[in-house]
């Protein structure tokens, strides 16, 4: 970044500081990952200069012959990975992908059945502070009070009672496998569309390690980062019958020109996801998550649903007599990055919470293995149990430094 360093020292310094943070801390935020240098090169390419409103072969600007190739590569690779009939890779985010689906099939005030945010859903699945909850009549389903797993009989009962036009499956903090086939059966029984938001598990689905929602859902949305390990962005997969409507909802419906440099980075990441070593990577994510969950439980920590089937773990910190906010802060102080998170049947404010959400996608990208999960579990428990003991926190910092020093990253930057 020689040009940036010479031209804008302040921005360069901030980026360098962030690189230092990523290198020196243990990244456990479940929605984050470390992309390859190839993905970063594509995103930092000259494609950032090109406007390309429209779609390949049907642009509103000239000079799009090369970016057309890039977008076609991205779309074709997604079809190969997930078996989708139609793909739109232009959404700038997962939220915009969800918005486009809503705009395609819903009218203002239509009833939608979505997962309660504190039970593991997402803001765009009907939260009253989000456009989705403002524009549409969302009815919530959740998890069982004892098992903390989705109660499909309750989903069916609510669907029969409220007759939604759309059912939304998928979550941002649900550590268990989702039965997409069952969701489609429920949707068919009440005459609803089914949309699956697979943002968190897309990489696991790509590797064949989580059931694929594409054969069951009318629409599938996802981000392109998280477990898929691409740049920050979104995409939509759908049945061919909805292709024109979905494309129109994205452009000109809710977006103008696509970010062609980001689409290039998406294409590179999708190419990586087609390789055999990506399947190994995804399996390691799950293995690490299971090992970490076991370690946390051995340390006496409480896990929502009692464990995990994917990359994600939700810790209930109430038995430690602290809040999620305190837990996030003290873990960050010793070099472990997590996020506070609501838990099912939450009683605390979303700014405080009773839980912490962690995930293994980023540490697995870095090369951490099973024995390292044992150390991370020990570190988390030790830090939370001694959150007011500065000597203990200093000891934890040293252990974090010793662990991260074993796994250098982005050494060419």
Curated annotation (Swiss-Prot):
PANTHER family: SERINE HYDROXYMETHYLTRANSFERASE (PTHR11680), SERINE HYDROXYMETHYLTRANSFERASE 1 (PTHR11680:SF35). Pathway: One-carbon metabolism; tetrahydrofolate interconversion; Amino-acid biosynthesis; glycine biosynthesis; glycine from L-serine: step 1/1. GO terms for molecular function: glycine hydroxymethyltransferase activity; pyridoxal phosphate binding. Its EC number is 2.1.2.1. Its cofactor is pyridoxal 5'-phosphate. Belongs to the SHMT family. The modification N6-(pyridoxal phosphate)lysine is found at residue 226. This is Serine hydroxymethyltransferase. Homodimer. It comes from the Bacteria. (6S)-5,6,7,8-tetrahydrofolate binds at residues 117, 121-123, 239, 349-351. It catalyses: (6R)-5,10-methylene-5,6,7,8-tetrahydrofolate + glycine + H2O = (6S)-5,6,7,8-tetrahydrofolate + L-serine. Keywords: Amino-acid biosynthesis, Cytoplasm, One-carbon metabolism, Pyridoxal phosphate, Transferase. It comes from Bacillus cereus (strain AH820).
């Amino acid at each position: 970044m020689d040009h940036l360093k010479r031209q804008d020292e302040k921005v360069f310094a901030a980026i360098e500081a962030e690189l230092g943070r990523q290198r020196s801390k243990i990244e456990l935020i479940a929605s984050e990952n470390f992309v390859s240098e190839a993905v970063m090169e594509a995103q930092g390419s000259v494609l950032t200069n090109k406007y390309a409103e429209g779609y390949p072969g049907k642009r509103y600007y000239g000079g799009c012959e090369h970016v057309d190739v890039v977008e076609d590569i991205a779309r074709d690779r997604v079809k190969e990975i997930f078996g989708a009939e139609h793909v739109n890779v232009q959404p700038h985010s997962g939220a915009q992908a969800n918005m486009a689906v809503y705009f395609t099939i819903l009218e203002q005030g239509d009833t939608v059945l979505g997962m309660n945010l504190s039970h593991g859903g997402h803001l765009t699945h009907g939260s009253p502070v989000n456009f989705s909850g403002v524009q549409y009549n969302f009815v919530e389903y959740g998890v069982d009070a004892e098992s903390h797993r989705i109660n499909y009989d309750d989903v069916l009962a609510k669907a029969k009672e409220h007759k939604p036009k759309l059912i939304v499956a998928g979550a941002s903090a649900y550590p268990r496998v989702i039965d997409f086939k069952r969701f489609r059966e429920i949707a068919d029984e009440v005459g609803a569309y089914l949309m699956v938001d697979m943002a968190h598990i897309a990489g696991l689905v790509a590797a064949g390690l989580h059931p694929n929602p594409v054969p069951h859902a009318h629409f599938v949305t996802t981000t392109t980062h998280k477990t898929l390990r691409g740049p920050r962005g979104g995409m939509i997969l759908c049945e061919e019958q909805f292709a024109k409507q979905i494309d129109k909802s994205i452009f000109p419906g809710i977006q103008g020109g696509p970010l062609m440099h980001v689409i290039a980075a998406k294409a590179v990441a999708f190419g990586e996801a087609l390789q055999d070593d990506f399947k190994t990577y995804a399996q390691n994510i799950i293995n690490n998550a299971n090992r970490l969950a076991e370690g946390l439980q051995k340390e006496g920590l409480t896990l929502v649903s009692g464990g995990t089937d994917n990359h994600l773990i939700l810790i209930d910190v109430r038995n430690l007599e602290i809040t999620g906010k305190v837990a996030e802060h003290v873990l960050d102080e010793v070099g472990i990055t997590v996020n506070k998170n609501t838990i099912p049947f939450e009683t605390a404010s979303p700014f405080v919470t009773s839980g912490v959400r962690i995930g293994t996608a980023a540490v697995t990208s870095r090369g951490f293995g099973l024995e390292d999960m044992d150390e991370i579990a020990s570190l988390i428990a030790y830090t939370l149990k001694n959150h007011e003991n500065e000597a203990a926190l200093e000891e934890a910092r040293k252990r974090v430094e010793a662990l991260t020093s074993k796994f250098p990253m982005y050494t060419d930057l």
